């Protein structure tokens, strides 16, 4: 969607949206693919903080319906572990409860846990995986807080410089981007 000569009308299509469009084109069945994977497209769209307009709005609406009425075992376990009631799922629940826990797997270097959570059909295994993602998210939050405190101590005093470059060899590479964003906002 970002190709200058592409002409695609929705410029804010997330990576999962592009993957969905590719799968739909390869199978020649957008409706079947969306019916099977609307929850995944919803999760990725909201997690990537895409505007909920156009196709993104359709993806999220259909995905939320799936999350409310027929969630995959892993997602159901993650909702339960995060304190979400299926019938009350909305974009905020996805963005502030589910997405950070799923993203924690990648940030903390253990992506297979999230992948298995998406794929498992065993509710007991799903619960164990959801608990692990929640544990990783708490660890990510702790590491983030530590790095943030260290980074703030390193900031120059006085007027804000045009650019700030901070580094520490021990900082976890999966979390420094979040800390950098927080510091840039301040």
Regions found by a protein language model. Name each.
Residues 27-186:
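Hydrophobic helix-and-loop "lid/oligomerization" segment in the mid-to-C-terminal part
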Residues 1-46:
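Short alpha-helices
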């Amino acid at each position: 969607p970002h190709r200058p000569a592409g002409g695609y009308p929705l410029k804010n299509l997330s990576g999962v949206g592009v993957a969905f469009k590719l799968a739909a084109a390869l199978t020649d069945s957008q409706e079947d693919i969306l019916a099977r994977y609307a929850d995944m497209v919803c999760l990725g769209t909201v997690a990537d903080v895409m505007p909920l307009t156009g196709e993104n709005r359709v993806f999220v609406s259909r995905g939320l319906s799936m999350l409310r009425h027929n969630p995959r075992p892993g997602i159901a376990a993650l909702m339960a572990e995060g304190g979400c009631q299926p019938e009350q799922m909305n974009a905020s629940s996805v963005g502030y409860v589910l997405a950070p826990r799923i993203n924690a797997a990648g940030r903390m270097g253990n992506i297979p846990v999230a992948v298995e959570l998406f794929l498992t059909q065993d509710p007991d295994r799903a619960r164990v995986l959801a608990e692990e993602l929640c544990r990783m998210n708490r660890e990510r939050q702790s590491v983030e807080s530590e790095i943030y405190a260290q980074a703030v101590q390193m900031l120059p005093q006085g007027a804000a410089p045009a650019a700030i470059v901070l580094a520490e060899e021990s900082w976890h590479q999966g979390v420094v981007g979040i800390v950098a964003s927080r510091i840039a906002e301040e």
